[in-house]
Design a protein with these regions (language model features):
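Glycine-centered hinge/linker elements that transmit conformational signals in sensory
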Residues: 75-77, 118-148
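Short helices/loops that flank or line small-molecule/ion binding pockets
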Residues: 4, 56-57, 73-77, 153-167
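Stable alpha-helical elements in mature extracytoplasmic
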Residues: 6, 10-13, 53, 67-74, ...
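Aromatic-glycine-rich donor-binding/catalytic loop that engages nucleotide-sugar donors
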Residues: 55-65
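Solvent-exposed loop/turn segments at secondary-structure junctions
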Residues: 1, 46-49, 56-57, 96-99, ...
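Extracytoplasmic/periplasmic solute-binding protein
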Residues: 30-43, 48, 70-121, 134, ...
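Hinge/lid segment of periplasmic solute-binding proteins
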Residues: 1-48, 63, 72, 104
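Extracytoplasmic/periplasmic substrate-binding proteins
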Residues: 103, 134-188
Length: 188
C-alpha cells in the first residue's frame, strides 16, 4: 500500500502525533516508519519471558536458568513423570510456527535474514539457526518439549497443575495464573 501511495502518514495527519508517539517505546515505533514518515502507532509489543515452577526447580536442585544452555539442561532434568505416573514436560511452548521460534534462533546467534531483510540464504540455513531448530526437534523427540497436537494440555492448565515445569510466554500470563492457579509458586 505504501508503494501505491495510498497510505497517509500519521505524523502528518495527527496534530498530537509526537505527544502520542512519545509515550510509546522508540524501538517499537521504529517498525512503523517507512521512508522517514510514520504510518502506524505501535500500540503493543510481544515480549516472551520464562515462567518457571519454583517448587519443581527446588525439588530438582536446579537454579533458575540464566542462559539458553542452562535452560536446555533444566528442561532435560525437569522432564519425566510425576508421582501419579503422568508425563511432565520440562518446557511448554504454545507453538513454534512463525515468530515463536525466533527467540531460540536469536539466542543461539542465528537469524532468518540479513538486516535489510533482503537475503535469507546464509542466515536461515546458518549453523547457528540450524542448531537452534535442531535443539527444539531433539527436545520434542525426547519427550521434553510439548507437541503441538490437538488435545495437548492448555498452557495455563499444564503449568498450573505441574505438568509443564517451565513455559515461555508473555507477561499477560500472570493474570491467568493468579486467577486460575493462585497457589502455584512460580517465578519469571
Amino acid at each position: 500500500f505504501q508503494k501505491m501511495n495510498i497510505l497517509v502518514p500519521l505524523d502528518q495527519q495527527m496534530g498530537d502525533f509526537n505527544d502520542v508517539a512519545g509515550q510509546l517505546l522508540p524501538s517499537a515505533m521504529s517498525t512503523a516508519m517507512v521512508k522517514g514518515s510514520y504510518y502506524a502507532l505501535a500500540l503493543n509489543t510481544n515480549t516472551k519471558i520464562l515462567f518457571y515452577n519454583a517448587d519443581a526447580l527446588a525439588a530438582a536442585g536446579i537454579e533458575v536458568p540464566k542462559t539458553m544452555d542452562e535452560m536446555f539442561a533444566a528442561i532435560h532434568t525437569l522432564s519425566g513423570t510425576n508421582e501419579n505416573g503422568q508425563q511432565v514436560w520440562g518446557l511448554n511452548e504454545p507453538a513454534l510456527a512463525g515468530w515463536n521460534v525466533l527467540p531460540y534462533i536469536w539466542s543461539n546467534g542465528g537469524n532468518i535474514t540479513d538486516d535489510a531483510c533482503t537475503t535469507a540464504t546464509g542466515y536461515v540455513n546458518s549453523p547457528e539457526t540450524v542448531a537452534a531448530v535442531q535443539k527444539l526437534v531433539d527436545l520434542y523427540a525426547d519427550g521434553e518439549f510439548t507437541g503441538f497436537n490437538s488435545g495437548d494440555i492448555p498452557m495455563t492448565d499444564g503449568f498450573g497443575t505441574g505438568r509443564y515445569a517451565m513455559m515461555l510466554e508473555g507477561p499477560w500470563k500472570t493474570a491467568e495464573l493468579s486467577g486460575a492457579y493462585p497457589d502455584v509458586a512460580y517465578g519469571t
